[in-house]
Amino acid sequence: MAHIGKRISKAREGIDRVKLYPIRDAIALIKERASAKFDETVEIAMNLGVDPKHADQMVRGVVNLPNGTGRTLRVAVFARGAKADEATAAGADIVGAEDLVATVQGGTIAFDRCIATPDMMPLVGRLGKVLGPRGLMPNPKVGTVTMDVAAAVKASKGGAVEFRVEKAGIIQGSVGKASFDDDKLAENIAAFVDAVAKAKPQGAKGTYIQRVAISSTMGPGVKVDPATLTA
């Protein structure tokens, strides 16, 4: 534990925890500190001026990152017949109906994204207590309940990232890898922030985007000046 504490303290050196850094400077700082033996994920955290306890202040959506996430997602699709065939052809990793429901109910969740055709939702609804807490429940608002399963699968494989505000008014997401070049990371971060901005609920009062910070998996957070972000 002491070793971890020293590493974190060292990584924080040279970072002003109050300053809002231009996006390029922030990216440089986190990449310099991404010293793990694996390709660290670059993550974003946004503090929003909303209270998700109120239905009219819920923030949820999906963003297609222009440069992908750097991660290969396993996609499951609940569909039958021709739609199941379309999903398979589009690259879905797991396709099924009652059999897939039984697999999930049995405790096996071997996927990172879940898509369903509308007619499958009464069946998929039985999995709410399992998929919901994991953020895997299909939802038409983010394009995962759809008849166009091929497009949904390709979007998921190509860099679509869902976001949803948490209890404290925070949204978090992955925007790439530390190995990405600066331009690609900057474009992904700007796209994520822009999508959250466009998802502003009618019930939001005052300053909507209050804070933006980025970090690598094992590194400290760096606050970003939102004015330097352009999608």
UniProtKB/Swiss-Prot annotation:
Keywords: Repressor, Ribonucleoprotein, Ribosomal protein, RNA-binding, rRNA-binding, Translation regulation, tRNA-binding. Signal peptide: none annotated. GO terms for cellular component: cytosolic large ribosomal subunit. One of its GO terms (biological process) is translation. GO terms for molecular function: rRNA binding; structural constituent of ribosome; tRNA binding. Pfam families: Ribosomal_L1. It comes from the Bacteria. Binds directly to 23S rRNA. The L1 stalk is quite mobile in the ribosome, and is involved in E site tRNA release. Belongs to the universal ribosomal protein uL1 family. Part of the 50S ribosomal subunit. This is Large ribosomal subunit protein uL1. It comes from Methylocella silvestris (strain DSM 15510 / CIP 108128 / LMG 27833 / NCIMB 13906 / BL2). The lineage of its organism: Bacteria, Pseudomonadati, Pseudomonadota, Alphaproteobacteria, Hyphomicrobiales. The gene is rplA.
